[in-house]
Each structure stands twice: as C-alpha cells, then as structure tokens.
C-alpha cells in the first residue's frame, strides 16, 4: 500500500514544482521589467474595457425604458384552440416539429398631442414601409441579405414541401418562397398606404368604420375627441431554426437603433436629447431597476444582498487600513483594487467569449460575494511578506529583485494551493445546472485564475516600483518609519479605534511563526464560506441569482387580439396539424419627434454634446477603438522609454562614484595581485609594417580604450563593462552570464573560447550591440593568422547595428565606409536631381557629372516606365509529359483566374500580372510576373508563389515541387529572358544634345559619337555574343547608385541590361541618345533601405519609403533616375573614347596621390592636389 501513496506524493510534488517554477519565472520577469509588465496588463485591460463598454452601450440601461420586461412564451398544441403560457426555459414541453414564431411590436406614442393627426399617421405609414422593405439583415454584403416582407415574416400558407421544421439547414435554404401575405397588424389594415391616408377627408369616420381593428391598433382611443395616445405595429417572424431566430434578433436591433427622424426610438434617445437629459435617463433607469429588483425579491434575499454589500465595503476599508499600517497610504491598496478590477474585466470578457450570458442582475448580486469570498487576502499576504524581508536590512543595501523573489518563494505555493481548491469548488458549482448559480460560479472561477496570474505579474511589478521609491526616500534621508511616526502622532482616539477594528494585528509584521499559523486558517475559512455559499444555493435556502423579472402582459388588447388572429390563421393554414410556439417580446418604444427645450443654455450643452458624440463614435467603432488602444500602447512604451532615459544619468553618476571607491580600495589593498595579473597577461604583437611606432599600445588596451570612448558617447549605461583588468575564473563567469554588465570583455572572450557562449549570439546575450561587435572582432582577430583585425582601421563605433541585426548582415565585425559622390544636378522629367553614387573608382562620378551637364544643356532627359513586374520562376515535376502539358494548358486557360486570386490573396500590394509557362521534359517552369508596390518584392512574390503552387497541387495532386526558384526568374544571373521579357522596372530614357554642346562640353563631334556607338556598343557586343550588354558601362553607374541607396548589389547582373542608341538628328547637327533598360530591380522599402545612411540618400532623391497615395511610384521614380544617370555616364564615356581622353583622365585621376600607410594617428598631409579628371 505504500507504493500508491508514494506515486501520488511524487505526482503532487511534480505538479507543485511546475506551478512554483511558473510563478517564479513570471515574478522574476515582472521585477526585472516592472514598467513594461504594467504597460502590458494595462493594454489587455484597455481592450477588455473597450469591448465591455461597447456591450454596455447596447444595454437598455442607456435607453429611455424604465422597467425591463422579459419575453412571454405561449404554446398551442395541435388539438388546442387557445394558447397557454409556458416557462421560457422549459424547452422540453415544446414539440420538436412546432412552428416557432417571434412577435415583435413597435409602439409609437405622443400622449400630449395624440397620434391621430394626418401628419403623424403619414409618418407611421412611411416608417412601416421602410421597416418592412428597406431594412436588410445581416449587414455584410458578402452573404445573402433578407428583408421582413420578402424573407423573414411568418406567412400563414407555407410551401407544401415544408418538412424537418426544426432543421437549421432547411430553415436557411427554404426561406419562404411563396408570395402568400405576411402576417402583420398595423394602421395599414385601415389605410393601405400613405396616398390612401392623404386622400381620406375624414379620419374619424374611417376609424369608426373599422372600429374593431382601430381599438387594437390605437391605444386610449377616444372617438369623440379624435384622440389616441399611441399606435401599435405588430410583426410576426418565422423563427423555425436558429438562423431565422438570429436574423429576427438582428432585424429588431436595427429597428430599435434607427437614427432619429420623424419617429425617434427610445433606445437612441441620447442622440436627440441633450447630454444632461441622457445622463438623467441613465441615472433614472438604474434607480428604478434597483427598486424593481427589491420589489421582486424576498426579504431573505434582500437581507443577504445587503449584508454582502456591507461586508464588501468593510473589506475595502480593511484593505486600505492594513496597507496604511505597513507604510503605504493609498498606492498599494489602490493597486490591489485595480488588480481585482482588471481580473474582473478579463473574466467577464472570457465568460462572454465562451458564450455564457451574465445578466446585470446576476452581476449586481454577485459583486459583493466576489469581493468578500475572493477578497484581497492573497495580495495582502504577499505584500506583508515583502515588507518583512525589506526591513531585515536597509533598503539601500538590498537588491530589490532578490527581496521580492524571497517573498514570492515563501507564499507562492500556499496561495496557489488555496486558489486551486477554491476554483475546484466553484467549478463544481458551475456544473450544478441551477440558473444564475452556474454563471456566478463560472465567472468566479475564471476571475480567481486571472487574479492569481495578475497578482504575480502586474502587482509584483508594482511592488518592485514601490520598493524602489522607498529606497530613493531612504537615500534622501526620508524613511517609511518617519512617515508612519508623523501620521501616528495626529491620530485621535476614535480614529485609532476604527483602524484597530479593521486592521490585521500582524499587518506591520510580527514574528513569522504566528503568520504561518494564521495563514492556513484564513484560507480554510474562505474555502468553507465558498462551499457553504454554493451548497446554500444548490439546496435553495435562498433564491438570489434566480429571480425572474416581469414578463410581457399578453392580456392587453393589442397583444391578445394579435395572438388570437395568429392562432386562427395558423389553424386555417396547411400547417394546422403542427403545434404553434410564439414568443411575445417587449414592444420597442418610439415617440413622435419634438423640438427640445432645455433650461441649460445651448452655449454649455452644445460643446458637451459634441464631446460625448465624439467619444461615443470613437469608443463604439470596432476599428477605431482598436487603433486607439494601439496608440495607447505606443504612447505608454514611449513614455516608458523616455522615463528610463531621464533616470539614466543619475544612476550613471552614482555607479561611477561607487566604481571609483571600489577601484581605490582595490589599489590600496591588492597592488601586488594587480601587478602579477598584468605581468601574466599575454601581449599579442602585430606585424611591424602595419602598426605605427608613434604610439605604443597593446591591441587589447587599444580596443578597450576605443570602446570606452565610443561608449561615453552612445552607450553610457555600459561604460563600466571593462574597467577592471582582472579576469575571473571561468566558473565564476558562467554564473554571471545572465548579468553580462558584470563581465568585462576579456571574461566574455574567455567564455566564448571555452564554448560557454556562442559567438553568433553575442548581441542577444550581451544586449549591447556595439560591444558584441567589438568582442567578436577580437575573437576573430586572435584566431586568425595575421592577428591584425582587432587593431585595424575597419570602423566599429557609432553605427546603427540595431538596424542591421536580423535584417542585413550576421556575424558583424564592423562596417565598410565607401565614399559617396554626387553627380548633377540632372534635369530628369523637368526636376533637377542630384544623383548619389557610392564608388571607389576614380573618374566615375566626374564623368557622369559631365554627361549630366551636356544633357541639361539640351533640355534634360525624358524617361518612361513601360513595364513593372518582379518575377519568380518555380520548377515543378510531373510523372509524365502528358500531365505536365495538361498543367500548362490549365494554367493558361481556366486555371489562370484561380491561380491569380490565390496569389493576390497573400499581400495587399502583390498583384499577379502575367504567367509564362515552359516545359522541359517532365519539368514545368512557371514564371510569375508581379507588381510589388515600392518593395523590390522577392520575399513578397515568393510568398505568393507558395500559395499559388498549393492551389495548383489541389488540381494536380501528382505534381511535385522541385524548387520555389527554378532559375526561370532569373535572379542574379545573366539570362536572355530578362533581356527579352523584362524583370523589375523596364525603363527607357532619351535626350537630344545640340551639336555645339557636343563640341564644347564633350570635346568631340556628333558623327564621331554615332560611329563609335555603332562600332563599339552594337557591333562589338554582338561579336562578343553579349546578352543585354549593348552599352559602354551601364553597370558602373547602376551599381554605384545601388550601393548608395541600399539596393541589392548582386542584382546589378540583370539590372545592368542596357542598349544605348545614338543617332544624328536635325540635319545631322544634333545628337539623339537613348538608353533602354528592361530589368532594373529596385525598391524603396525593405532590405538595405532600412539603414539610416542609405535612407538619407533616398530622402535626397525624394523616394524614401512607400508612396503615400500610389503604391510603387517611388520605386518607379528611382528606376527612372538610375536609367537617366546611366545615359549620362554612357554619353560621357563614349565622348571620352571618341576624343581619346580616357587613358589620360584615368592616369591623372587615379594616380594623383599615393595611398598612405595606415597608422594609429591621423594621416599626414602630402601637400599635393588630387588628380583632375575629364575637363569640360
């Protein structure tokens, strides 16, 4: 018998270990990042608040009604000729094949003037026409929509094929197809339409002629005075089936919330009444609702609820008193209350998501019992233990995180145990099947779970901030004890008595033994209270949570006559053999619109009304409310960031002072140890010619020195990483891995070299990107043959590594500066644009600038984008060539739209424009050509291709995907298909240069240029078998602009496809030049364009980021600029070749200065001017 006990004990220990570990991790995360945790919980609670507020706005609390009526259900079995009232929850008494009908009524009232005026009756008839024929449900246009007269109404003669009357599917598809009249009861029974009414000369006589109908339609009818206070419209809905019932409810909601017109719904009374009237209505409804509930309840119910509210108030008072006794006046007690409030909102939202309706009556009765039984004992216990541990030593000498974690360790498992047992009891109550009790127990169980989670996350973060504030007070000389002493001196006798009555004897913290003894007793008492509460309701000792409100009075003439007519017509129909079940719903009140008069001046009410209307719109709107929450999220995180930045300088000064004290102490006591350490430290010597002898410094010391100076500018919070030269043992360093700021650089290097830390993960582990790059650089340098990288001239500091990580490069050891020159400005399509070019080739920028000057003198360049489509060419395989051919034909014909729709569904910007399919044996190559907005688009189109291939696989299951990229694109490789079909942006540019400019600026003639272009660019390239290379040096200019603007340099292979054409025009006096580039692959978002230097160049061109109104226009503009710049470079180089200036210019420019030897100091001036390039 011992084995089972041992197994059960082991299982319990395992469960306790899992729960304890989870609590510790949550608490550790909260204490490490308290502000972030508070922000996250506030955001979740904000989402819950917006949703619940929108839900409350639709409640009748906000409408003009005072008393809430519940529907009355009546049932007529097959043989009965009258209705009998049935319980609305007793579904078992209703036959499965019963015809179900909902009866909704609209009551239009005007007690002051009556409703028998011609104008009012005309408004009612117009309203009836609109309600029956113009209100469609549901709102979505993506599904079939239905109106009352055509689809929703109950028709006395249903189709003869009617069967399976309770089937949802039958109800959805068999919406009344015959044109039999709908059942409705209204003034239209007297006047057919508005025209008939207006033609009626004597309304009183007409009513007398139809007196029986009029008595049931008009309320308080007085013929002698031609007066009636109200008019009733009755509508019967066929709700046989859940879908029909849902449609009827939607129709009712849309009618009840119609905007004010001639008739105003009391549900929308706030839209017509002023703000003060609306607030008065809400207050009045709440008061009358409470009075109604008190009248309906038994005396014992009232006593139980009243005692519950008194105990709830006492619980709140006790909480504040006990927290004040521990040293927190209002902060922690308010935080505990908010902890419970957040849990309550999240629990209510969860219960709503589970499809359980919790009525306001249940909530009103449940809140005091929730506050008392669940209470605030758990957060109070945690707070008390935290303050006990914080008083063991001065706060200035404590690690706040450690103090809170000690407290969590001692109380976590007892709290979890009590909470778990209470949840089990409440879950059993939720399974009891008693209406009201089920909802209460389910809500309580979920609330307990949320309260437990939020306490060890949000409230723990609040405790961490509270202790930090107390520590700051102690540093400034003000302790919590001093505050408590100051408050106790002024406490009177009565106040002390009240505080003693509501306070916990051990709130200030006595001995631990007593607390351990009291803790289980409190938990057991609470558990017994919950058990007793559930048992009391199961055995019906009291009826709270089960009271049923007043129902619709079906004996009123306006309802009774309608029910009799409904039953009579049903018995005369083809479905007389079926039972009839009718639910009579409360009437929807409307009143005739009147001019409002208020005792409050318009100057006050109008601004308040505008404010409330704006608030209602933004809070109720399903999209705007989410964006408001996101804006709150961003705002809170920005404030968090700024708060951290604001408090850093003070912390740094304190840390520096402490470091100085520690350093002085070490130097005064351990000088011998430090000298030995320095002697033992190895020195790495670099080859002589590389390092200058002007400064003698070891590489390690130099790196630390540089790293220190860089951190003083951009990483102040890590300035003390490597101030100590003592390298601790590896085991001690491993223990400090989670606090990398405590390790110096040499210790991190030793961890990597010993396999305790991955080199590629340095950024993630250290949290300081620049420090990680420097350490990786040292590691690679020491492992290399030459060992020169660590002290090399490759820059390290002041770079945006946060933009690089995870996007542009891995295993970063620095960055490579490339000089950026500017050609131009160049007149491109009427705009003067400076062209940035990053290059190390001398003469390139100057040559392009000369071409710009010549083109500008001729009126500038004109460009046009003739095609835009990034491509991807996956490769798939079939078992036979017949299946491959069948796939090709299917994609080119009926499958084209299917594939296109699947592709386009993956992105807002990617749009499939063209498909080109080729076969090679059993292999099929599909070339997708797609517009991708302002992105270059390779990732975007790859995602679309995957989706399209999955759709093709559904039609061809035997298809096998070989590769998502089958080199049929073709990307980063020379290919004729890009030259012929195009890829990316296909651009053409042209310019006309006068002959005089050719001779003056370019130093040659038009004839010489034309002849050179034909011989070199056309015939020469053809002789070489070139594909797309009919140009002089298009790749030169394109790649320079690519590097400057963050494009993919490897794509210059296909992007440089260009044909340059020159022709003598205007009687051979002027030169016409054009460049055609069919495959320029560029983007202005993503990739290297996220780096700030590259973004600055895009800013200079005016094409950074996505275009605000026309997606893709910025990327097309960049392609136009590149093509025009290529034309300028082509023109200048061809002119230099024609004039024989090329060699002279390159010799002068590239050999003008001698490259200096790298030294640790600034390079001395050579005193020579750089060489000149092609002169104009």
Curated annotation (Swiss-Prot):
Glycans are attached at residues 224, 238, 553, 596. GO terms for molecular function: hydroxymethylglutaryl-CoA reductase (NADPH) activity; NADP binding. Residues 56-299, 352-355, 444, 546-622 are lumenal. The active site is at residues 841, 972, 1048, 1146. Pathway: Metabolic intermediate biosynthesis; (R)-mevalonate biosynthesis; (R)-mevalonate from acetyl-CoA: step 3/3. Keywords: Endoplasmic reticulum, Glycoprotein, Lipid biosynthesis, Lipid metabolism, Membrane, NADP, Oxidoreductase, Steroid biosynthesis, Steroid metabolism, Sterol biosynthesis, Sterol metabolism, Transmembrane, Transmembrane helix. Residues 700-721 have a biased composition (Basic residues). Residues 1-34, 321-330, 377-422, 466-524, 644-1176 are cytoplasmic. NADP(+) binds at residues 907-909, 934-942, 1150-1151. GO terms for biological process: coenzyme A metabolic process; ergosterol biosynthetic process; isoprenoid biosynthetic process. It catalyses: (R)-mevalonate + 2 NADP(+) + CoA = (3S)-3-hydroxy-3-methylglutaryl-CoA + 2 NADPH + 2 H(+). Belongs to the HMG-CoA reductase family. This is 3-hydroxy-3-methylglutaryl-coenzyme A reductase. The gene is hmgA.
């Amino acid at each position: 018998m011992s084995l089972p006990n041992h197994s059960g004990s082991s299982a319990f220990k395992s469960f306790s270990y899992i729960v304890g570990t989870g609590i510790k991790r949550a608490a550790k995360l909260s204490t490490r990042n308290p502000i972030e945790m508070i922000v996250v919980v506030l955001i979740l609670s904000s989402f819950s608040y917006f949703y619940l507020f929108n839900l409350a706005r639709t409640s009748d609390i906000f409408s003009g009604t005072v008393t809430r009526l519940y529907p009355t259900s009546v049932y007529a079995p097959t043989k009965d000729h009258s209705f009998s009232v049935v319980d609305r929850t007793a579904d078992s008494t209703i036959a499965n094949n019963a015809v179900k009908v909902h009866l909704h009524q609209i009551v239009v009232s005007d007690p002051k003037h009556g409703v028998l005026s011609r104008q009012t009756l005309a408004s009612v008839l117009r309203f009836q026409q609109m309600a029956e024929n113009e209100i469609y449900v549901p709102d979505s246009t993506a599904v079939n929509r239905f109106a009352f007269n055509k689809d929703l109404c109950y028709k006395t003669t249903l189709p003869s094929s009617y069967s399976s009357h309770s089937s949802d599917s039958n109800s959805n598809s068999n919406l009344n197809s015959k044109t039999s009249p709908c059942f409705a009861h209204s003034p239209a029974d007297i006047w057919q339409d508005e025209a008939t009414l207006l033609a009626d000369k004597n309304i009183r006589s007409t009513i007398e002629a139809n007196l029986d109908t009029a008595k049931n339609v008009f309320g308080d009818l007085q013929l002698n005075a031609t007066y009636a206070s109200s008019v009733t419209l009755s509508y019967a809905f066929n709700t046989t089936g859940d879908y029909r019932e849902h449609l009827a409810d939607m129709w009712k909601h849309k009618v009840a919330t119609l905007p004010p017109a001639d008739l105003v719904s009391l549900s929308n009374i706030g839209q017509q009444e002023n703000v003060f009237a609306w607030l008065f209505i809400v207050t009045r409804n709440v008061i009358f609702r409470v009075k109604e509930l008190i009248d309906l309840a038994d005396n014992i119910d009232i006593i139980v609820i009243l005692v519950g509210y008194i105990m709830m108030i006492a619980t709140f008072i006790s909480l504040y008193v006990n927290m004040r006794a521990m040293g927190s006046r209002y902060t922690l007690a308010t935080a505990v209350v908010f902890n419970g409030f957040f849990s309550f909102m999240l629990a209510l939202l969860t219960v709503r998501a589970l499809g359980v309706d919790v009525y306001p009556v249940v909530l009103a009765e449940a809140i005091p019992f929730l506050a008392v039984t669940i209470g605030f004992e758990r957060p109070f216990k945690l707070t008390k233990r935290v303050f006990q541990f914080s008083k063991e030593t001065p706060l200035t000498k404590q690690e706040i995180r450690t103090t809170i974690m000690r407290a969590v360790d001692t109380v976590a498992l007892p709290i979890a145990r009590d909470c778990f047992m209470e949840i089990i009891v409440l879950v059993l109550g939720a399974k009891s099947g008693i209406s009201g009790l089920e909802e209460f127990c389910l809500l309580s169980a979920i609330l307990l779970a949320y309260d437990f989670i939020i306490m060890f996350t949000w409230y723990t973060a609040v405790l961490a901030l509270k202790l930090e504030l107390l520590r700051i007070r102690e540093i400034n000389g003000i302790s919590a004890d001093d505050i408590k002493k100051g408050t106790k001196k002024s406490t009177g006798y009565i106040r002390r008595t009240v505080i003693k009555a509501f306070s916990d004897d051990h709130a200030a913290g006595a001995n631990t033994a007593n607390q351990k003894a009291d803790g289980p007793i409190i938990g057991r008492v609470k558990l017994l209270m919950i058990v007793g509460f559930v048992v009391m309701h199961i055995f019906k000792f009291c009826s709270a949570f089960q009271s049923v409100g007043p129902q619709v009075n079906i004996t009123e003439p306006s309802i009774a006559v309608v029910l009799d007519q409904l039953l009579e017509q049903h018995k005369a129909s083809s479905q007389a053999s079926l039972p009839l079940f009718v639910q009579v719903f409360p009437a929807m009140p409307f009143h005739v619109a009147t001019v409002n008069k208020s005792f409050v001046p318009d100057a006050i009410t109008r601004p308040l009304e505008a404010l409330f209307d704006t608030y209602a719109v933004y809070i109720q709107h399903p999209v705007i409310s989410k964006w408001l929450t996101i804006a709150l999220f961003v705002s809170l995180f920005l404030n968090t960031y700024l708060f951290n930045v604001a408090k850093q300088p003070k912390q740094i000064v304190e840390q520096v002072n402490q470091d100085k004290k520690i350093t002085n102490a070490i130097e005064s006591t351990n000088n011998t140890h430090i000298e030995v350490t320095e002697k033992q430290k190895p020195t790495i010597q670099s080859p002589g010619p590389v390092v200058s002898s002007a400064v003698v410094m070891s590489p390690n010391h130099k790196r630390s020195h540089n790293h220190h100076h860089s951190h003083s500018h951009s990483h102040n919070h890590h300035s003390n990483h490597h101030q100590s030269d003592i390298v601790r043992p590896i085991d001690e360093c491993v223990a400090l891995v989670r606090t990398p700021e405590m390790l110096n650089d040499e210790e991190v290097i030793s961890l990597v070299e010993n396999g305790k830390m991955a080199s590629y993960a340095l950024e993630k582990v250290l949290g300081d990107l620049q420090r990680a790059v420097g350490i990786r650089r040292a590691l690679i340098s020491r492992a290399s043959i030459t060992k020169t990288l660590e002290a090399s001239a490759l820059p390290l500091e002041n770079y945006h590594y946060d933009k690089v990580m995870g996007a542009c490069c891995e295993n970063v050891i620095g960055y490579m500066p490339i000089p950026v020159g500017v050609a131009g400005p160049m007149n491109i399509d009427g705009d003067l644009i400076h062209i940035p070019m990053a290059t190390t080739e001398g003469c390139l920028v100057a040559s392009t600038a000369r071409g710009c000057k010549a083109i500008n003198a001729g009126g500038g360049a004109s460009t046009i984008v003739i095609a835009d489509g990034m491509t991807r060419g996956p490769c798939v395989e079939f078992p036979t060539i017949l299946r491959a051919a069948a796939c090709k034909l299917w994609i080119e014909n009926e499958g084209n739209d299917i594939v296109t729709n699947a592709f386009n569904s993956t992105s807002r910007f990617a749009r499939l424009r063209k498909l080109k399919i080729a076969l090679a044996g059993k292999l099929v190559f599909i070339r997708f050509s797609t517009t991708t907005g302002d992105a270059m688009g390779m990732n975007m189109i790859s995602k679309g291709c995957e989706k399209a291939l999955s759709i093709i696989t559904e039609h061809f299951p035997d298809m096998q995907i070989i590769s998502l990229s089958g080199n049929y694109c073709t990307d980063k490789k020379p290919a004729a298909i890009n030259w012929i079909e195009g890829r990316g942006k296909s651009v053409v540019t042209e310019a006309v240069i006068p002959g005089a400019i050719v001779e003056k600026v370019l130093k040659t003639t038009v004839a010489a240029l034309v002849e050179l272009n034909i011989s070199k660019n056309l015939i020469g390239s053809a002789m070489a078998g070139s594909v797309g290379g009919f140009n002089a040096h298009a790749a030169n200019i394109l790649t320079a602009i690519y590097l400057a603007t963050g494009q993919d340099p490897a794509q210059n292979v296909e992007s440089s496809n260009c044909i340059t054409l020159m022709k003598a025009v205007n009687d051979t006096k002027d030169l016409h030049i054009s460049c055609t580039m069919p495959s320029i692959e560029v983007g202005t978002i993503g990739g290297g364009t996220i780096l700030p230097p590259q973004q600055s160049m895009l800013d200079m061109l005016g094409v950074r980021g996505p275009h605000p109104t026309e997606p893709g226009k910025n990327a097309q503009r960049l392609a136009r600029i590149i093509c025009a710049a290529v034309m300028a470079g082509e023109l200048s180089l061809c002119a230099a070749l024609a004039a024989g200036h090329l060699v002279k210019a390159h010799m002068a420019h590239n050999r003008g200065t001698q490259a200096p030897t790298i030294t640790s100091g600034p390079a001395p001036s050579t005193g020579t001017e750089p060489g000149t390039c092609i002169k104009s």
